[in-house]
UniProtKB/Swiss-Prot annotation:
Catalyzes the removal of elemental sulfur atoms from cysteine to produce alanine. Seems to participate in the biosynthesis of the nitrogenase metalloclusters by providing the inorganic sulfur required for the Fe-S core formation. InterPro entries: Aminotrans_V_dom, Aminotrans_V_PyrdxlP_BS, Cys_deSase_NifS_bac/arc, Cysteine_dSase, PyrdxlP-dep_Trfase, PyrdxlP-dep_Trfase_major, PyrdxlP-dep_Trfase_small. The gene is nifS. It comes from the Bacteria. This is Cysteine desulfurase. Keywords: Iron, Iron-sulfur, Metal-binding, Nitrogen fixation, Pyridoxal phosphate, Transferase. It comes from Klebsiella pneumoniae. PROSITE patterns: AA_TRANSFER_CLASS_5. Pyridoxal 5'-phosphate binds at N148, Q176, S196, A197, H198, T234. Homodimer.
Length: 397
């Protein structure tokens, strides 16, 4: 059976060249990078090179601004701990990754006031609400650069400038943009930026935090000098080497993301032409090249995914961290997508390994699946939606 992987926002395949770079550090170069003998020296050299590779991809001015970690989305807690006690407010958005939302809820229980900025039906951030929430009481702004479900990009540069006008730190969750669009963090007012290697063909379990030189910071993990004293614990050299290699390869392949955008558009346009009652989530906004979220009205996204999987196609109904729930995702609810559409959202996310013939296979396979499921739907009759008064339409609670 043909296999097509279009769930790259959840994770990506490991690049063979990344694996090749990692292997010696699983077998031969097993020394501790903190050791000064001949076993530790190659590990330390590899660690320094990985800092340089990550800094180059992110556009950081100094390799020492990179902190390798297994938990890049811990940044809101890092930043809040570092700030002055009189600043007790944090700004985020309603469509952040569940890990960020959970961190903000934890801080809220500790007495912080959390401003959650709304989005419109296209997934665009309410900038008027954002400006109104800013004040000298705000310690931190923590928002994603691109939404993991829709691919919609936020105006990060403008937001960082506005945050600095009020003396707030600015953190950007860049997990879904690194390796997909050019980043020059050193030319922005971003104080902190987090990313994860497995989203751009690196290994799982390793990420990094960009921390602008001079930014206040107090580590959550203490007890060691590693990562310039900012992340205690013996370094995961194998994983870090893999992330460094993935960063270098991502830099090389960045120009090819234009082609990925063209493939995304091919998938999007052909499905819109062949399937009725389908909407593109955030289609009117700037998006990362490889993400498209389609809402197939009047059917369940989980059913679509199961039938796609039987045809060898891997996609997602939203964030991998929330899949398994039958409720529409918090992102769809925040965008106020109609219930009958929000339940039928499918996210296709491409990578540099995606080929045109795979896109064409999806375009040929999906419409019959939609027809089959709609034939069973109480909301669909004779090839079109049933009258609104003929069925019960649930609403969000």
């Amino acid at each position: 059976m043909k296999q097509v992987y279009l769930d790259n926002n959840a994770t990506t395949r490991l690049d063979p060249m990344v694996l090749e770079a990692m292997m010696p550090f699983l077998t031969d170069f097993y020394g501790n990078p903190s050791s000064i003998h001949d076993f530790g020296i190659p590990a330390q050299a590899a660690l320094e090179r990985a800092h340089q590779q990550a800094a180059a991809l992110l556009g950081a001015e100094y390799p020492s601004e990179i902190i390798f970690t297994s938990w890049p989305r811990a940044t809101p807690r890092h930043a809040a701990i570092a700030l002055l006690p009189e600043r007790r407010e944090i700004i985020t958005s309603v469509v952040e990754h569940p890990a960020t939302l959970a961190a903000c809820e934890h801080l809220e229980r500790q007495g912080y006031r959390i401003h959650r900025i709304a989005v419109d039906s296209e997934g665009a951030l309410d900038m008027a609400q954002f400006r109104a929430a800013l004040s000298p009481r705000v310690a931190l702004v923590s928002v994603m650069w691109a939404n993991n479900e829709t691919g919609v990009l936020f105006p990060i540069g403008e937001m960082a400038e506005l945050a600095h006008e009020q003396g707030a730190l600015f953190h950007c969750d860049a997990v879904q943009v690194v390796g997909k669009i050019p980043i020059a963090v050193g030319q922005t007012r971003i104080d902190m930026l987090s990313c994860s290697a497995h989203k751009f063909h690196g290994p799982k379990g390793v990420g990094c935090l960009y921390l602008r030189r001079g930014t206040r910071f107090r580590p959550l993990l203490r007890g060691g000098h590693q990562e310039y004293g900012r992340r205690a614990g013996t370094e995961n050299i194998c994983g870090i080497v893999g992330m460094g290699a993935a960063c270098e390869l991502a830099n090389i392949h960045l120009p090819g993301m234009t082609h990925i955008g063209q493939l995304r558009n091919r998938l999007e346009h052909r499905l819109l032409a062949s399937v009725p009652s389908v909407m593109v989530m955030g289609g009117g906004q700037p998006r990362v090249p490889g993400t498209v979220n389609l809402a197939f009205e009047f059917i369940e996204g989980e059913a679509i995914l199961l039938l796609l999987n039987q045809a060898g196609i891997a996609a997602s109904s939203g964030s991998a961290c929330t899949s398994g729930s039958l409720e529409p995702s918090h992102v769809m609810r925040a965008m106020n997508i109609p219930y009958t559409a929000a339940h039928g959202t499918i996210r296709f996310s491409l990578s540099r390994y995606t080929r045109e013939k795979e896109i064409d296979y999806v375009v040929a396979t999906l419409p019959p699946i939609i027809d089959r499921l709609r034939a069973l739907s109480p909301y669909w009759q004779n090839g079109k939606p049933r009258p609104a008064d003929a069925v019960f339409t649930p609403v969000y609670g």
